[in-house]
Amino acid sequence: MRNKFCALLVMVYVLSFVGFAEALTLRLAGQNPVAHQNSVQMENFKKIIEEKTGGKIKVKTYPAGQLGDYALIYEEVSKGTIDMALITIPPKFDQKQQIYFTPYLVSSWHELYKLFDPNGWMYKKVSGFHDKMDIKFLGFFMDGFGGLGLTKEASKPLDPKVPKNVLCRIPNNDVAKLTMTSMGYRTVSVPYADLYTALQTGVAEGWYGGAAVHSYLGFRDVVKYYYPMNIYTELEQWLINKKTWDGLSPSDQKLIESTVAEINKNAVKIAEQEEIMYQKKLAEAGIKVVKITPEQLKPTVDYVRKMVWPKLDKVLGKELTQELIGEYAKK
C-alpha cells in the first residue's frame, strides 16, 4: 500500500511539471502599430512556436506599446516581468547602446544585408551589452533606414553645410544630436509617445529616424515632406530575459533561435519592398517624397562621417569608437 502511495505521489509530481510545461506562456512586447512588420512578425513568431511545440509553449503578444514604451519594456525584460521583446534599445542603461545610431555605417540596401551578420563584429558587441542587463540577445530585426519626416521644406537638404531652418525632433541620445547638428538641423528632444502632438503643434517641425513606413503609419496626417536620407539603420532587437531563457530546454532554445533567425533573414528584403511601397503611399497621401540617388547622397555621407565619427568617443568611449571606425570606415 505504501509503495502504491509513493508511486501515486511520483506520478502527481511528474504530471504537475508536464502541466507546467504545457502552460508556459512567453509574454512578447513590441512598440510599433499592429500593421507594422515588426508586429506582424511577432504574430508569425507566436504561430511558429506554438505549432512546433504542440502548444507546450504559448506566446502572448503585446504590440503597439501596450506594455509601455521601449525604454520601459527593456527595463521590464531585464527584471523578468516581461519575458521577451522586439524593440528599439534605449541608451539610458548603457551609453554604448547608442552605437546603433551611428550615422552612415552603411547607406545602401546591398550593404545593409551584410552589416548585422550573426557572425560579425556588431552582433558580438551587442550580445555583451545585453549580458550585463541579464538579457539574452537573439538578433536584429531590420526595418531599413532612418529618414526624415518634416512639416516644412528643408533648405538644401543635400548640402550638410547649409542651415536647414527646421527644428527636428530627436530621441534623447547624443549620437542623434551630433548627427543632426552636423547636417544643419536644430534639434529638440521629445518622447516618441508625444511626437505626433509635437509635430501638430509646432513644438517640432520634423523628426529624425523612421523609414517611410513609420512616417506613413504614424504621422501621415502631419508631415508634409519625406526625405529618404538613409541616416542610420532603423532596427529593433529580439530579446529574452536571461532567467527565462535558462529555464527553457535546449531544444526549445534552439527552436526560438532558429525561428528568430529565419524571420530576421527575410526582414531586410521585406523592408526594402516596404520602403518603395510606403514612399508611394506617402505620395498618394499628398506628402512630397524627395527622390535621392546614391550619388546625390554621397557628399552628405562623407561629410557626416568625417564630422561625427571622431566625436563618438565622448559617447561610446575611445576603445569602442576606434574599433567601430576600424571595422566600418572603409565600407
Predicted feature descriptions by range:
Residues 7-17:
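Bacterial N-terminal signal peptides
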Residues 22-111, 123, 130-131, 136-331:
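N-terminal secretory/targeting leader peptides
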Residues 1-4:
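Positively charged n-region of N-terminal signal peptides that target proteins for export
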